[in-house]
């Protein structure tokens, strides 16, 4: 069985946080004999300060399933979407994007959006756009964790998110595997305890299709390349041209002007 998690974060300020979460998912999955990969969306590079970016974790039972799931720009049927800043629930406008992508757009039917926030799920839901299917909204009580590109704010947000994911998507990673991965990677029992508490305390509520922000996300219809041909393309000169009245032979192509 294949599962995927996307982590939406603020570029530069939360880059390390996003990568630590997705890497932790894969490390935990390996403890269960599964295979996985953690990667960033290449369209986000180079990241801009505060501009939304994404990191992904894909877990599968074998290499064949994993490779089949990775043959795309970004996973589009995620089990869990993590927003490590609750303002991202208003929608994601990445720097290489044109328009606003709802936070739950790439979350599968019945999947979960997990946000770190000091607000209740009901308050966070007001910012989330409606979805045609039922989904779940989960909240970990926390303020947004911001740091820098080279300096990491080790406030346990990463392990708390990992603990919550074990609760929300046990088919991907179980709590015992998350705890084992934390011990091996960070060797900190306090972080193990933080993950366990997040597993127990994460708030979850079901969301119906008629709940949430009813506004239509704005988008731009950009012209196709062939519609801008006059401004983008200089027609090439034919390699050779036939000569009228000649039987065979040719003359070199030349610019008529």
Tell me the role of every PLM-derived stretch.
Residues 1-256:
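Active-site cofactor/cluster-binding pocket
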């Amino acid at each position: 069985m294949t599962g995927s998690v996307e982590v939406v974060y603020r570029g530069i300020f939360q880059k390390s946080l996003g990568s630590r979460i997705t890497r932790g998912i894969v490390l935990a999955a390996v403890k269960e004999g599964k295979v996985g990969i953690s990667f960033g969306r290449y369209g986000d590079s180079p990241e801009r300060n505060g501009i939304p970016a994404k990191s992904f974790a894909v877990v599968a039972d074998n290499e064949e399933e994993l490779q089949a799931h990775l043959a795309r720009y970004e996973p589009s049927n995620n089990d869990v979407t993590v927003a490590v800043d609750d303002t991202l629930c208003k929608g994601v406008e990445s720097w290489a994007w044109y328009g606003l992508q709802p936070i739950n757009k790439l979350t599968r039917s019945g999947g979960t959006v997990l946000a770190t926030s000091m607000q209740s799920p009901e308050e966070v839901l007001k910012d989330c756009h409606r979805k045609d299917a039922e989904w779940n909204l989960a909240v970990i009580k926390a303020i947004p964790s911001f740091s820098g590109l080279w300096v990491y704010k080790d406030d346990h947000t990463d392990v708390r998110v990992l603990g919550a994911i074990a609760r929300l998507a046990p088919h991907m990673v179980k709590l015992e595997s998350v705890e084992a991965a934390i011990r091996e990677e960070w060797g900190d029992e306090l972080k193990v305890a933080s993950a366990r508490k997040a597993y127990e305390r994460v708030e979850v509520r079901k969301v119906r299709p008629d709940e949430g922000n009813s506004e239509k996300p704005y988008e731009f219809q950009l012209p196709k390349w062939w519609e801008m041909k006059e401004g983008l393309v200089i027609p090439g000169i034919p390699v050779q041209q036939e000569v009228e009245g000649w039987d065979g032979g040719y003359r070199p192509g030349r610019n008529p002007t």
